[in-house]
Amino acid sequence: MAIANKNIIFVAGLGGIGFDTSREIVKRGPKNLVILDRIENPAAIAELKALNPKVTVTFYPYDVTVSVAETTKLLKTIFDKLKTVDLLINGAGILDDHQIERTIAVNFTGTVNTITAIMSFWDKRKGGPGGVIANVCSVTGFNAIYQVPVYSASKAAALSFTNSLARLAPITGVTAYSINPGITKTTLVHKFNSWLDVEPRVAELLLEHPTQTTLQCAQNFVKAIEANQNGAIWKVDLGTLEAIEWTKHWDSHI
């Protein structure tokens, strides 16, 4: 997918990886970049607008834990304004295994609900034009960081959901792929809680190993967007982009 002249919605486009990815997107000249985030950051929005004045950058406050109905209402406002949306990026995420319910709500349920809401506008069975979804999951969806099993499981769930969305594309007209960053130097990983405090030093121990910068992650994120491969499972780790082959151990045969 060429980003130029496209209309893009980016959930959590002002976060660590999100903001650098927003920068890379704006450089490529989309028609509209609509950022949905929990906390407004006028300075960040101003920076994006200045980076490429030809791009219309707008912000709407959005908490992914709201209901599908509330999300649908917000999306209707956006679709009424833009008429079409080409790409939805779901980037919301938290890392804190003390907050079990919120971790699942933000990392998994919020993604499911946001996508469920946008299907009202995209699903070809309802006369929609289809669309593309990029879900930010995690390498922990492949193999857990076992000291944060709630976070890891929430990302595995998001990855599984994305894989199913891709298989449903012939029915819905909506394609999907996952972006799975490795350990990236953001505020998310500088300090976080393990489940039941099984490893109080989990953040410190994790950062003893090689990491990537948010810019490295963002640059490869955009390459994955441009590749636009339905069902792709992209590993974005240590400054590299790699398509992962998923091993099938069972098939429903339906």
Swiss-Prot record:
Choose any GO biological process term that the UniProt entry carries and state it: alcohol metabolic process
InterPro entries documented for this protein: ADH_Drosophila-type, NAD(P)-bd_dom_sf, Sc_DH/Rdtase_CS, SDR_fam
What is a GO molecular function of this protein?
A: alcohol dehydrogenase (NAD+) activity
Name the PROSITE patterns for this protein.
ADH_SHORT
Which cysteine residues pair off into disulfide bonds?
none
Q: Subunit structure, per the record?
A: Homodimer.
Q: What is this protein called?
A: Alcohol dehydrogenase 2
Where is the organism placed in the taxonomic lineage, from the top? Eukaryota, Metazoa, Ecdysozoa, Arthropoda, Hexapoda
